[in-house]
Amino acid sequence: MTNFLSEDFLLMNEYDRELYYTFAKNMPICDYHCHLSPQEIWENKPFENMTKAWLGGDHYKWRAMRLNGVREEFITGGAPDKEKFLAWAKTVPKTIGNPLYHWTHMELKTYFHFHQPLDETNGENVWDACNRLLQQEAFTPRALIERSNVRAIGTTDDPTDSLLYHQKLQADDTFHVKVIPTFRPDGALKIEQDSFADWVAKLSDVTGESLDTLDAFLHALKERLTFFDEHGCRSSDHDMTEVPFVEVNEQEAQHIFRKRLANEGLTKVENEKYKTFLMTWLGKEYAARGWVMQWHIGVMRNNNSRMLHKLGPDTGFDSIGDGQIAHATAKLLDLLDKQGALPKTILYCVNPNANYILASMIGNFTESGVRGKVQFGSAWWFNDHIDGMRRQLTDLASVGLLSNFIGMLTDSRSFLSYPRHDYFRRILCQLIGSWIKEGQLPPDMERWGQIVQDICYNNVVDYFDMKETVRL
């Protein structure tokens, strides 16, 4: 029997272990997409307790607790923090087979040196012991980042953000991790949402411009793009339930924008035309700045309207959509490519049925001298588990070049989530090690080890052109 969460966790043979211990384990981390707060990094305040550090904002855990029948009072409600933690501890054993079970125990082991399964029998002891440790200097947000061997972090930021805390961090010589903003213009694109006019008004306030025409709106967005670029931004990020593509000209887009600001209803086709126009315009702007464009495709968000009204978005009521994406993705990428304005692009899909669609799509759009210009992104959200990661890796390898893959990201709001990179690295080494053991690859460990290191760190640093700003 293999011991639970041993040093050789997920490493099944000598090849897995050599790849992991010799090549993967000690590679730095570039967490190029996450939802950490730059303000919390800057302020670097100790966490009050484990609920604040571990459960706050974590809709993965909230969702599991709801599925286990925990009352909302003990999830997002007014129950004392200790009672919320104990409710989570009681839920943990029920998460077997879910990555939450592994993540929970990897995080406890990595940061708190706790090696036993967490459950209802020891939750109170774990609460007390971990809370004592959280008051130590080694458990502040910055210390946790540095202890995790992180070199760079890509946050997720609205175009109207002042980037005040990014500026403070960039000027702080005592913190050596690069905290880089990411331009996330969902508010500009989601013209169908009730909040669209308010977002345009906010952009108007930030830029000091009247945004009553599409030209003025684009000019304001361009100002913000330049502002983000001046503060180190290397990429954009887009949430897409479906990829938009309907042929459109500028005059149509201007008319649609005016209608929306006049509070006139838009058809679905008009919504898609506007999004197609703006995504094309943004893609050109990203390419001109040398940015990476990220698409997160296929999530059906806020499905429970009752809970959306009660708790707001991003609270655990999203799921996998089944929309058709192949045609629109190809058309939108091609529209940019034929104009010589396709930036480096990462395509993530939450629906694993689309894996081969995107893994094959990336080979359509290459550029002479550029390795892996368009990437099939890491297994995301509901795929962020052993089977999902293996499937993403093998699907990519089957129809593309796994060796050029830019690897793992946390997509997390927690400073304790970096063991997910170790989880990924073990799965990667297990996969390649199994190919060696089965005779599918020769035992050229230096060659495969270099590919492992590239996937863990080197490729993403090259891809985001960060060689001059991060250290090995």
UniProtKB/Swiss-Prot annotation:
InterPro entries: Metal_Hydrolase, Uronate_isomerase. Its EC number is 5.3.1.12. Transmembrane segments: none annotated. It holds the Pfam family UxaC. It is an enzyme of class 5 (isomerase). Keywords: Isomerase. GO terms for biological process: D-galacturonate catabolic process; D-glucuronate catabolic process. Pathway: Carbohydrate metabolism; pentose and glucuronate interconversion. It catalyses: D-glucuronate = D-fructuronate; aldehydo-D-galacturonate = keto-D-tagaturonate. GO terms for molecular function: glucuronate isomerase activity. Belongs to the metallo-dependent hydrolases superfamily. Uronate isomerase family. PANTHER family: URONATE ISOMERASE. This is Uronate isomerase. It comes from Halalkalibacterium halodurans (strain ATCC BAA-125 / DSM 18197 / FERM 7344 / JCM 9153 / C-125). The lineage of its organism: Bacteria, Bacillati, Bacillota, Bacilli, Bacillales.
